[in-house]
């Protein structure tokens, strides 16, 4: 008797037809890998990404930070809460626009970021070794393109041109 064509083994081997599902599944898997690695320093992968972005942009407004992370403001607020609670970041009033809040990395936040950065480097090297350096570089480039506003615009135009 032939095995059913949709056994879990065959599903695992077959490529995803839906690019959205494939990207989300890969993102969840990578998120699990990074979460497991960051567990020793008490952060989640999303929290590490936030700390890095805050450090890069340097006291961004909530809106600017959300745009950099391609997140909505409510999701950003939810993700920031434990970092604020733990004293790693603080919200400060924008001097130019008192209605806006800026996200500031505290001294403890900088210390935690450096601790986590060492773990991040180890995971990055592990990924490059497991995936192959050239493949990893190409994947990063492709994902950066997909995450860009230009690609989003292009997709919208193409979507509306298909009848």
Predicted regions and their residues:
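C-terminal regulatory/oligomerization modules of transcriptional regulators
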Residues: 1-11, 133-163
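The alpha-helix within a helix-turn-helix
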Residues: 66
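Short, locally clustered residues in the helix-turn-helix/winged-helix DNA-binding domain
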Residues: 24-27, 52-56, 117, 144
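Central "turn" residue of the DNA-binding helix-turn-helix
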Residues: 58-59, 70
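Residues that mark the N-terminal boundary/hinge immediately upstream of a DNA-recognition element
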Residues: 44-46, 61, 106
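Charged, amphipathic alpha-helical coiled-coil/dimerization segments
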Residues: 31, 59, 81-141
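N-terminal leader segment of winged-helix/HTH proteins
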Residues: 1-41
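Helix-turn-helix DNA-binding motif, specifically the short coil turn and the N-cap/start of the second
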Residues: 72-75
């Amino acid at each position: 008797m032939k095995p059913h064509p949709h056994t879990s083994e065959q599903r695992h081997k077959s490529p995803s037809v839906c690019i959205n599902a494939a990207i989300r599944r890969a993102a969840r898997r990578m998120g699990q890998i990074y979460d497991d690695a960051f567990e020793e320093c008490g952060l989640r992968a999303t929290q590490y990404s936030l700390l890095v972005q805050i450090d890069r942009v340097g006291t961004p407004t909530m809106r600017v930070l959300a745009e950099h992370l391609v997140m909505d403001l409510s999701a950003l607020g939810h993700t920031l809460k434990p970092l604020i609670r733990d004293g790693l970041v603080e919200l400060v009033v924008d001097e130019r626009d008192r209605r806006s809040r800026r996200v500031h990395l505290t001294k403890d936040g900088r210390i935690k970021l450096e601790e986590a950065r060492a773990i991040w480097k180890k995971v990055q090297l592990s990924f490059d070794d497991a995936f192959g350096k050239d493949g990893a570089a190409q994947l990063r480039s492709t994902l950066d393109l997909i995450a860009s506003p230009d690609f989003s615009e292009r997709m919208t135009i193409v979507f509306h041109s298909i009848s």
